[in-house]
Amino acid sequence: MAKKRKSSASDHHCVYVVYLRDPRGDGKAGYYVGMTGLTPEQRFQNHKQGNKAARIVTRCGERLVPRLYAHLNPMPFKKAVEMEAILAESLRKRGYVVFGGH
């Protein structure tokens, strides 16, 4: 199991990755990368229920992919903003279709 880093009271933001089923209609899977002050599980439920949701996640999101982000969380807000972009770019460089991550 991945070792979690120590966190302070201000470290309550998280990055998360959602597996997307055929987001472009070409038969290929993709990912959505986001950040939140909620738990990734709570944020995913909000997406699926249409609450402050990215349409692509509401429509194509199947599940969270914790192996890609769990070892990074939690973190301060500024770090989460940076990490969201870094994580998205890392997945793009590996050839994946990535939404979000800005």
What name fits each language-model region?
Residues 37-81:
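Conserved short loop/helix modules at catalytic or binding sites
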